[in-house]
Regions:
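Conserved glycine-rich cofactor-binding loop
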Residues: 31-32
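A glycine-rich helix->loop->beta "capping" turn
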Residues: 86-99, 105
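A short, exposed helix-loop element centered on a Lys and neighboring polar residues
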Residues: 132-133
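Substrate-binding pocket helix/loop in short-chain dehydrogenase/reductase
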Residues: 108-109, 116-118
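The beta1-alpha1 cofactor-binding region of Rossmann-like NAD(H)/NADP(H)-dependent oxidoreductases
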Residues: 72-82, 114-115
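Residue(s) in the substrate-gating loop at a strand-loop-helix junction
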Residues: 152
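A hydrophobic alpha-helix adjacent to the NAD(P)-binding/active-site core of NAD(P)-dependent oxidoreductases
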Residues: 69, 112, 120-121
Length: 157
């Protein structure tokens, strides 16, 4: 099943309640699906939006909507630090973080190669945690911020 930003829970707009044009958002996994839709929705609400993904060639289409493409690999600390620093240098703030980058390796546990399982945890768990660690201090300093973590049924054991 595919879900779009329009199908998000009704409470979600409250998280994006800043006045138009006053917020800065970072959306990971913005090259397709929920991440891409979320980036467009935030932009329509007036946010300055940075759409992050490993494959920046797929992000170029977002620029027509005013979304700023950002090369970021959530398994690479230097890549995440560089991306966060760029946003802070250009705007001075990050008001919303949408952790949407994800990777799925499916199958019975005995059939999934352990390297694939590790990669999935690196992207879906440790990447999310590290990017959140990089951004929380800036949100704390400002006294506000919103972090949204997107997951999947794949996280259910």
């Amino acid at each position: 099943m595919t879900t779009t930003a329009e199908q998000a829970p009704a409470a979600a707009p409250q998280a994006f309640s800043k006045a138009p044009g006053t917020g800065v958002a970072l959306v990971t996994g913005a090259s397709s699906g929920i991440g891409e839709d979320t980036a467009h929705k935030l932009r329509a609400l007036g946010y300055i939006v940075y759409g992050a993904a490993r494959r920046t060639d797929r992000l170029q289409a977002l620029t027509a909507d005013g979304i700023r493409p950002l090369a970021m690999d959530v398994t690479d600390d230097a890549s995440m630090s560089s991306g966060v620093n760029r946003i802070l240098e250009e705007t001075g703030r990050i008001d919303v973080l949408v952790n949407n980058a994800g990777y799925g390796s499916y199958g019975a546990i005995e059939d999934v190669p352990i390297d694939e399982a590790r990669r999935q945890f690196e992207v879906n768990v440790f990447g999310l945690a590290r990017l959140t660690q990089l951004i929380i201090p800036h949100m704390r300093t400002r006294g506000s911020g919103t972090i949204i973590n997107i997951s999947s049924i794949g996280g259910r054991l």
